[in-house]
Amino acid sequence: MSPHSSFLIKLLTVALKLLIVVLVAWFIRDTLLKAWQQLGRQTWNWQPLWIISAGAIYLLGLLPAGLYWHYVLKVLGQQTQLKNTLRAYYIGHLGKYVPGKAMVVVLRAGLIRAPRVDTALATVSIFYETLTMMAVGAFLAAGILAVRLREERMFFWGAIALMIISGFPILPPVFRFLAQLAGIGKSNESTCANLSWPGYTSILAGLVCMSVSWILLAASLWATFRAMGVDNIGLFEHGPEYLAAVSLSMVAGFLSFIPAGFGVRDLILLELLVRLFAISDATATVASAMLRIIWLVSELIISAILYFVKTK
């Protein structure tokens, strides 16, 4: 390759990275402005320490899911360090604010790229981890809503439908069939051999990891209420309600394919908060908007920190 061609490729690579950054920044700005507008002009007794706590709990809640993705990469035969996996996982969340969800895959697969990491298998692992999280979230929501909102079966059956949509592709036989249908590993024997995984053990591991994640995300919603000065809806007394509200709204938002589920996630969360906690529409609206802002700002902060972490 001539020096001129090499320089041109490097220039195009830099330009592409800058374009990705600009796209992500633009859609994050749009999401943040919409969420801020939802807060309206109502006055709340904001508690800064609880706002920070809600963000910290959210980031902690993502950790088990990131660890599960690392597990998936390892059993797929990919050699990557845990710090690199978690770095890619957290930064990759910014991609969900770009239409189509594809930017999540682009960011994660690009950041995890290494000589001993197959890009095709890395992409497969991202879909597998994400669908596992969505399936577990819908499963938990369905179980809780079947008891807590027995009179409103729409939410229960909606959770069941979402669980089937996200859970069916991760069943081992279905997963292998879909991977073959997509042509993954067709031209690489080692890649094809690694796709003999997953088994039902991986589903069990995902159930455990993702359940912990969802519980912590529910705790972040509780901390958001505390940040608003609402202290009469305790976490231990209403833990299942927090869990159902967060999980069902997030799963529905994800499967809507709208950037960050904006609108869909917020509407379902609002409706569930009103029904499960018997609070006003105004309180539920502010909680929903504030939760989105706290989570987005937390993602921006951790991504900015991790971006400058040196990787090998």
Map each language-model feature to its residues.
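Transmembrane alpha-helix interface/packing and boundary motifs in multi-pass membrane proteins
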Residues: I91-V98, V246-F262, D266
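Hydrophobic alpha-helical transmembrane segments of ABC transporter permease domains
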Residues: F127-L149
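Mid-bilayer segments of alpha-helical transmembrane spans in multi-pass integral membrane proteins
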Residues: H93-A102, T130-A138
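Predominantly cytoplasmic-facing regulatory/coupling regions of multi-pass membrane proteins
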Residues: M1-Y90, A146-F254, L276-K312
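Re-entrant/interfacial helical elements at transmembrane boundaries that shape
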Residues: A102-P115, S256-V274
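Membrane-interface alpha-helices at helix entry/exit sites of multi-pass transporters
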Residues: L82-R87, K101-V106, R113-T130, I279-M290
